[in-house]
UniProtKB/Swiss-Prot annotation:
Function field: Part of the high-affinity ATP-driven potassium transport (or Kdp) system, which catalyzes the hydrolysis of ATP coupled with the electrogenic transport of potassium into the cytoplasm. This subunit binds the periplasmic potassium ions and delivers the ions to the membrane domain of KdpB through an intramembrane tunnel.
Subunit relationships: The system is composed of three essential subunits: KdpA, KdpB and KdpC.
Name used for this protein in its record: Potassium-transporting ATPase potassium-binding subunit
InterPro entries: KdpA
Membrane topology of this protein: Multi-pass membrane protein
Pfam families noted in UniProt: KdpA
Compartments reported by the entry: Cell inner membrane
Transmembrane segments: 6-26, 66-86, 135-155, 177-197, 251-271, 283-303, 382-402, 428-448, 493-513, 537-557
One GO molecular-function entry: P-type potassium transmembrane transporter activity
Gene designation per UniProt: kdpA
Family the entry assigns: Belongs to the KdpA family.
Cellular component per GO, a single term: plasma membrane
Length: 572
């Protein structure tokens, strides 16, 4: 227990310590200020902008920015889709892995372009080295950069006033990659290599084990992909076992680095926001609410796994475990990590849009699995994905401002800008599109016979497997209850559609809100008239309950049919 507590304190301390310097660095990068990595990034940026030409020089309106983002994502999708279809004909394929089928290639291309990294294939047997390096790993960078760009646009729109432009997508994209994602990923990858993570393009090794059997040991460019997998909150593993595999996550050090890197940029953006709008207390308030939500989720998931089998005491097996005070659920968990390292990792992963796991989610207790679903279903606003976590949280922040202002009889405003009906329409659109997507697709899948055949469990847990898949897809997480055999045409197509709607539907609403906010006047008198202190403890509590009630209750009926009923079936 003391080890678990120390690990928790060190993790939180690390997160707090890196938030200000990294947040300041991100602020400087996107404000064209001098940084200590200019020597590395500027040569890449010059070549990149030279190729783009005039399109990278002029600032864009919110609509123009969105359409540039969308056109880039469409081109990226087509490229990845074609590579996956034709990978059997392409080089760097020593295992002679065949091209994917249409529905699986469609699903995978959508998955990586939307920063979801849902995988209906086994990484080491379904994708060649060429596809891993040129298609999937590249998307890990650019899809993460797209999310960061959207967050930066939203921050700019709050900071600027009486303007029409929100920045240039192509310029922002290069800054996100060359100044932030690429250099940090290189450092992390080097550390991983020294920790024992392979980085090569060798054919798989055939070895004769001490037990007398033959075994195939997969090889590949793992360290480079693993670094951006966590930093970019992508989550798609080189191996089917993801970060439970010793080649992806060999030591307690790599496990810790992965957890910190998942939250690093998302946490830093809270300080970036505060610094940009000239009110760092506002940024720390956002950080604090996120942290409280995270701690509560972690506590519930950890307790449910530590005591997840206590109900078996009533099943007359207490003599077997009589010397143990409680029965912990170690099924599906690496013994080298134990329960707390597993629940900490998976809480981080499902709170962000990462989706990587170091233990099997389908083997968690019903309540443990439910907490993972809730982390995703509330929009992954507990730090969240790179960029996506911030703009998702901002939607709840806007709603809390609106509710709080009306409760005290004041005109809603935030940081001196009037919040009007049109702003709230886009806010609610962003908040409701993913839950609607989850409920509609889950309801349809629940009555499709082919989906039933893809389940390894029936009843409440089987429904939980379906529900988890669409929550994960719609919120661009990518983790899964492995009991669902997802490589069917129906599941590949519908989960891909949920990923597209959940990603670009929300981004569209955020960009429209940004376009509205950037045009508004900033009035110090408006802040005084509103009299709603958005950095106060009371407002923090309001934001907290807005997230819990609006985000949590939206999905509660579905959770009642899944993990909650599953838990009740175990107890009674």
């Amino acid at each position: 227990m003391s080890y678990n507590f120390i690990l928790f304190v060190v993790f939180i301390f690390t997160l707090v310590i890196i938030t200000k310097p990294l947040g300041t660095y991100i602020f400087k990068v996107f404000n064209n200020e001098r940084t200590w990595l200019d020597w590395f990034a500027k040569p890449f940026q010059r070549v990149y902008l030279l190729i783009l030409g005039e399109s990278s020089k002029k600032e864009q309106s919110a609509k123009s920015y969105f359409f540039s983002l969308l056109s880039f994502s469409i081109m990226a999708f087509i490229f990845v889709f074609v590579v996956l279809l034709l990978q059997g004909l392409l080089p760097f394929n020593p295992q002679e892995i065949k091209g994917m089928g249409f529905s699986q290639a469609f699903n995978t291309a959508v998955s990586f372009v939307t920063n979801t990294n849902w995988q209906s294939y086994s990484g080491e047997t379904g994708v060649s080295h060429f596809s891993q390096m040129l298609a999937l790993a590249v998307q890990n960078f650019v899809s993460a950069a797209v999310g960061l760009c959207v967050a930066i646009v939203l921050i700019r729109s709050v900071a600027r006033h009486e303007a029409t432009k929100v920045g240039n997508f192509w310029n922002d994209l290069g800054k996100a990659i060359f100044w932030i994602l690429l250099p940090i990923s290189i450092i992390i990858a080097i550390v991983y290599i020294f920790q024992g993570v392979p980085q090569n393009i060798m054919a798989y090794l055939h070895v004769h084990t001490l037990a007398g059997s033959d075994q195939i040991i997969a090889q590949g460019p793992i360290a480079s992909q693993e670094a951006i997998k966590s930093l970019g909150t992508n989550g798609g593993g080189f191996f089917n076992a993801n970060s439970a595999h010793p080649y992806e996550n060999p030591t307690i050090i790599t496990n810790y680095i992965q957890m910190v890197s998942i939250f690093a940029i998302a946490a830093a953006l809270t300080y970036t926001f505060g610094k940009w709008v000239g009110n760092t207390k506002q940024g720390w308030m956002i950080f604090a609410v996120m942290l409280v939500l995270f701690v509560i989720s972690l506590m519930v998931m950890t307790i449910s796994e530590l005591h997840g089998l206590d109900f078996l005491h009533s099943k007359n097996i207490q003599d077997i475990y009589g010397q143990v005070g409680h029965l912990s659920n170690m099924e599906g968990k690496e013994t080298r990590f134990g329960i707390f390292n597993s629940t900490l990792y998976n809480t981080v992963s499902t709170s962000a849009s990462d989706g990587g796991v170091n233990s099997v989610m389908d083997s968690y207790s019903a309540i443990g699995g439910m907490m993972a679903m809730l982390n995703m279903a509330i929009g992954e606003v507990i730090f969240g994905g790179i960029g996506a976590g911030f703009y998702g949280f901002f939607m709840f922040l806007m709603l809390a401002v609106f509710i709080g202002s009306l409760m005290i009889g004041r005109a809603p405003s935030f940081l001196g800008k009037r919040i009007e009906a049109n702003d709230m329409k886009w806010t609610m659109f962003a908040l409701l599109i993913s839950p609607c997507c989850v409920l509609v697709f889950t309801g349809l899948a629940a009555v499709i016979p082919s989906v039933h055949q893809a389940l390894t469990n029936s009843g409440a847990h089987g429904f939980s497997e379906i529900l988890y898949a669409y929550i994960s897809g719609s919120n661009n997480n990518g983790s899964a209850f492995a009991g669902l055999a997802a490589n069917t045409s129906y599941l590949n197509i519908t989960i891909a559609l949920s990923m597209l709607i959940g990603r670009f539907g929300v981004i569209f609403a955020v960009m429209m809100l940004a376009g509205s906010l950037v045009k508004k006047k900033r009035s110090s008198q408006m802040s005084e008239i509103s009299s709603l202190d958005t950095t106060s403890f009371i407002f923090s509590v309001l934001v907290f309950f807005t997230i819990v009630l609006i985000g949590g209750l939206t999905i509660f009926p579905a959770l009642s049919l899944g993990p909650i009923l599953d838990q009740l079936n175990l107890n009674f």
